[in-house]
């Protein structure tokens, strides 16, 4: 079984979605079940409703799952596993207070050395502390694993101390809950971000202590860097939020296409998730950080907009008139996102705001003169744009730039865009709706 294990503590990050997509693809390729595990044991950081938001995003991406579980439902199991380790002398109670440990951390910082917990501290405050934590005994050997992307990774014994499994309130730490659940659900491969590399040896030690003889394969994805700063994209970066990208009008299929493409060797530029299942391979992923490029994402989104069928296009733009499909297709050529397309069609159909767009009083006056001339015309009486244009020029007594710029604004709501002769047939059939001024 493969899994995706998000925490409901904020917006879904593009790095997390990338991991979800890759786990889903490999699960499909290997004909294995796919598990979604909501890691909700950190009650203080959980945000209500974020779990459902994550699930909705996965559905939008075309990702389905065979099983959905909440980690908090397994707490009794986690405690049972901790008790097992205590009985087998693989774990121990630690009575050292948080204040004592904080002083030791500060001392290590001042001495410019890494902080390492010492097992001899375990009973120092046993008489005063009646709520101990449970720690796994530190290993006396190196921990190594063969990462599917990073290759051989090794941690020396002095890099790993006796870390906490259960907190004072008997709640499991992230690493303990994660390792226990991965065993419980028989997870065979975990694809996740490289920020989890330091967690992996701890989880391996926990699983070994619990008697696992079937090691999990790990694949740690390189981080995604911001295209401008070159730094890791954090949750503070708008574009790192999948929700933000969707709200900006990026199609789910384009987002998935892009996240599969970056840092990867792909056989074609534009593809669907189902197509990627046919050829995706972890071996083709680069070990170097990927750079996020919003301009290229917009390019891919533009290509996917062109691929939308008529029914989907009308639904996504909230246009009910099928006669406007051709116009939508023309506007797509100038749009990178669904939001841009919606804005174009809205400007086209809504009353025109010449106050907002006029350059000076003379320009506003020309707009009004031309507007009155156009109102007297029956657009459907003209066989083509050329004959319509000549009559509009004659009636308004305007020509050149004084004619064309006001004409474009009055007919499309925009000072630039698709050539007017191309969209004139759609203007003809909707001219009474189009030719209106904003009060």
Curated annotation (Swiss-Prot):
An example Gene Ontology molecular-function term: tRNA binding
Entry's family note: Belongs to the class-I aminoacyl-tRNA synthetase family. Glutamate--tRNA ligase type 1 subfamily.
Compartment(s): Cytoplasm
Top-level division of the source organism's lineage: Bacteria
Source species taxonomy: Bacteria, Pseudomonadati, Campylobacterota, Epsilonproteobacteria, Campylobacterales
Listed Pfam families: Anticodon_2, tRNA-synt_1c
Positions of short motif 'HIGH' region: 6-16
Catalytic function, reaction form: tRNA(Glu) + L-glutamate + ATP = L-glutamyl-tRNA(Glu) + AMP + diphosphate
Subunit structure: Monomer.
Name used for this protein in its record: Glutamate--tRNA ligase 2
An annotated GO BP: glutamyl-tRNA aminoacylation
Role description: Catalyzes the attachment of glutamate to tRNA(Glu) in a two-step reaction: glutamate is first activated by ATP to form Glu-AMP and then transferred to the acceptor end of tRNA(Glu).
Residues noted as binding ATP in the record, renumbered to the chain: 235
PANTHER family: GLUTAMATE--TRNA LIGASE, GLUTAMATE--TRNA LIGASE, MITOCHONDRIAL-RELATED
